[in-house]
Amino acid sequence: MKPYRLSRRAKADLDDIWTYSEQRWGVEQAADYARELQATIEMIAEHPGMGQPDENLRAGYRRCASGSHVVFYRVGVRVEIIRVLHQSMNARAHLG
């Protein structure tokens, strides 16, 4: 597994996802969804090429869907998780 790092924005995204999920569906569902997102991030670190390249967004960026969200990342010496955005969000506006 490659080491990985969450950007400050990715950490904030995950916190916001937790808060929304907890308020909307309760603690148990929020915890389940958080585990699903974490498992996706760990899978990306284990298999960095699994995500789809998103060169139109930014050079070197990749994307991988997880539930209703998309994990945006890039691969170098380590995997950098850049953002975790809802699939309905305009990624270009949030990553541009």
UniProtKB/Swiss-Prot annotation:
Q: Does the keyword Chloroplast apply?
A: no
| A single BP term in Gene Ontology | protein heterotetramerization
- Stored InterPro entries: ParE1/4 (IPR028344), RelE/ParE_toxin (IPR007712), RelE/ParE_toxin_dom_sf (IPR035093), TA_system_RelE-like_toxin (IPR051803)
Swiss-Prot/TrEMBL keywords:
Toxin-antitoxin system
Pfam families given in the database record: ParE_toxin (PF05016)
Q: What happens when the gene is disrupted?
A: No visible phenotype when deleted singly or as the parDE1 operon.
What exactly does this protein do? Toxic component of a type II toxin-antitoxin (TA) system. Its toxic effect is neutralized by coexpression with cognate antitoxin ParD1 but no other ParD or RelB antitoxin. Low levels of wild-type toxin in the absence of antitoxin decreases the rate of cell growth, and results in death or loss of colony formation abilities and greatly elongated cells. Low levels of a mutant missing the last 4 residues leads to loss of cell division while cell elongation continues.
The UniProt subunit note reads as follows: Forms a ParD1(2)-ParE1(2) heterotetramer.
Q: Which family does it belong to?
A: Belongs to the RelE toxin family.
User: What is this protein called in UniProt?
Assistant: Toxin ParE1
